[in-house]
Amino acid sequence: MYEPLSLKLHSTHYERFVIKGKFLYKNNLKFYIKGVTYGTFAPQIDGQQFPLEAVVEKDFAMMSANGINTVRTYTVPPIYLFDMAEKFNLSLMVGLPWEQHITFLDDTSRQEAIISRVSEAAISCNQHPAILCFAVGNEIPAPMVRWYGAKKIEAFLKKLYDAVKEVDNEALVTYVNYPTTEYLKLSFFDFDCFNVYLESQAKLSAYISRLHNLYGNRPLVLAEIGLDSMRNGEDRQAEVLKWQIETVFGKGCAGMFVFAWTDEWWRGGFEIEDWDFGLVTRDRQPKLALPVVSNSLNKLPVNESHLPFFSVIVCTYNGAATIRDCMEGLKRLQYPLFEVIVINDGSTDQVADIVKEYPVRLINTKNNGLSSARNTGMNNAKGSILAYIDDDAYPEEHWLHYLAYAYIHSRHGAMGGPNIIPPEDGLLAQSVADAPGGPVHVLLTDEIAEHIPGCNFSVKKDVLMKVGGFDPLYRSAGDDVDACWRIQEAGYTIGYHPSALVWHHRRNSLKAYWKQQKGYGKAEALLELKWPERYNGLGHLAWAGCIYGGGGNVTVQTKKDKIFYGTWGSAAFQSVYQPGSNFIFSIPFMPEWYLFMAMLLVPSVAGIFVPTLQWAWVAFASALGIFVFQAILSANSSAKKSAWQQQTFTYKFILTMLYIVQPVARLTGRLKHGLTPWRKRGAGLQLSNFYCFNSRVFTHWSEEWLSAETWLEMIEQNLISLRTRVLRGGAFDRWDIQVRSGWFTRARGLLVIEEHGANKQFLKFRCNHKHSRYGFITIILLSIITFVAGLYNIWAIGVFTLFLGMLLVAKYIMDSISVSNSLKKGFLMLGYKNDTSSELKMVSKGIHLLPLEKPIQTTLPDWFDKHELQIDHKSTTSN
């Protein structure tokens, strides 16, 4: 049993630690955990596993003098240690130990006893002001987790969390995990803690990025880092601790604990004498690492001598309602080298008057749209790095520090970070934040992004100017996507720092949300028109990376997650691998699902007058039910991941309705601006190019030698200029380039080059078709239904399915002609030589090879003069 602390503490009011985004706060001030571990120590006569009070006082005084502000204990400390911590302004992470090293879930009574002891231990601390948080476990052995399975362990840890919250609801509660069980899903804890021992700076940096992405917009604390000085020497220990601390804070962690304060360590009934992890020796003599650690802790979060100059650019149009929050947030930035430029894009409200109250540069322009305003900011910026933030967002105080750290330690051309809804926003705004269609980032790796949203978008000025700035075509949305693609096409990478965050207000009304989603639908249409090769037949973008952020769609999973344990559970880093979602189950989330339901509604309504069509009501109800079920499933999943604490019926109902409404708004914007499933892309129709089941070979003679890669890149760029969706062949594909125009068919090209000496080349380009199985199956099914309906004289159904089948056959033929013509023209355009002075020309989209009108003069024999060579390929179809 635990003895309770002095009851007088209950009557003393004090501020508790709270979580805000990625960090801890106390008294509205950010609190970086700069900690050391303390213990465990050999038991005293009274059973306490801590040194005598005089020793603790000396230790805590030395800690405080060296910039340490937090102490982690592995057992509940005695009263004097709490009071001593308060005296020296130290906070405590209190471990609540229990027998996690045995099969503790076998016996229900043992589980209840553990929960009871953890609860009593928390009560015994009596809400002492020195408490930072409670840790209800530390590294449950991986074999135990594997023995019971992750879900049972997670469920038991949730019970321990609830037990502490019942006796101290305002206390922060965590669990200390480690890489071998990183797959545990513990989002119910207040923040995440990991013990990580890596002796390579690059590996530590990469693993911290991984942990940030695994656990999202929550504080991450490394609960143990360090190095043994007995085996590595004091010099090496000091060197490693220096870069460990700088990396931990530079990568955006909320804090860390050095293991340990002293070499004195007692475990398992024995004094451990063959490990020396301490900053001081057993007799409390400082090691070389102590002043190094102290110096590193005084330069947080970024310890860099040469920081870049930032130009923070805010573009606003009638943003008076939120611009003050933005200006106040920028005013609180702790970064030493930056300017703020506000572009007033023809606002008609009071935004200019508000901005004039702050020491920033205000530039007033006509209402030319968001992209134009961003370019105005770029052209007037003094900084080498441009940091764009929306007028309805405001930055975390070290936003620029983290961006600077990321730029200094990488070669990225651009950099982004998360955008989080402010905790003070209300129910509706939080529902919108958790709904689909919000500003999210897409990551290719833990540190490299494919897309970063414009509300938190930074880029090197020379990089942005090199790619031509933002495209004025996008007046309100889509500009960030287009810019990201052009930056990557120019050969640069886009980085992501998980703690370079901004607080972003979401739409606070359903009308505003509807308007926003319609605008995003319009932006999708404009992007598809400019980048058709990135979209599929239905007009949807297939990201190469993984989408992070709220509002994700959850499909029915046919496969379970797989955990990599290693042989016999021996892997040091054990991760969970999630199977990709099934395409079939993702179809109901597409806006076009509403078109499908509308198509079913037509015969359903007709069934009121034609009894044979009443079956359509079943199909329509099924389609609607599938969509509503998926919306409820996704809304519940999003709610579980949300930071919103009030998980009420109203919140979940609004969230579900937003999941239902969002595709309609998106579809409205897409259809209105031409992004339809029946749109035409590519070189158009030419009946002479209609070949479906045989191959064709096209040829080209060149007097100038080029590599196969260069020829293929030229063909690819020609196809892009024809607004064709292009895909490169992969490492296992026996084709080089694929084009697709619609739903049912795609054409593939394979290049071979004959070398004829004197730099002369003869190119052969074989093209054939790859047909959609789904298209054939659909047409066959409709044909069968039509035949059966005619056989039984059910003419209404027969006519309907016949008409639908004829439409699909016509669509199939047009798609086949289009892709055939596109691939042919893309190759034959090689007959136009590029002027060397304009071989690479920058346009708003990126870098393109532009064909000139003058054809290449060749010396081919007459029988080679034809561009096209027809060959019988009965047995040479492409794989």
Predicted regions mapped to residue ranges:
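A conserved acidic beta->alpha catalytic loop
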Residues: G329, N344-A352, A393
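Conserved donor NDP-sugar-binding/catalytic core segment of glycosyltransferases
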Residues: H398-A429, T493, S499, H505
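Short aromatic/hydrophobic "clamp" motif used to bind/position activated sugar donors
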Residues: L386
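Active-site mouth of glycoside hydrolases
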Residues: F23-F189
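Short, acidic, metal-binding catalytic loop of nucleotide-sugar glycosyltransferases
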Residues: E328-L337
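Aromatic-rich peripheral "rim/lid" segments of glycoside hydrolase catalytic domains that contact
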Residues: F259-L307
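Extracellular glycoside hydrolase catalytic/binding regions
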Residues: R146, K151-G250, V280
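A recurrent flexible, glycine/aromatic-enriched loop bordering the glycosyltransferase active site
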Residues: I421-P422, P439-D462, K466, R475-S476, ...
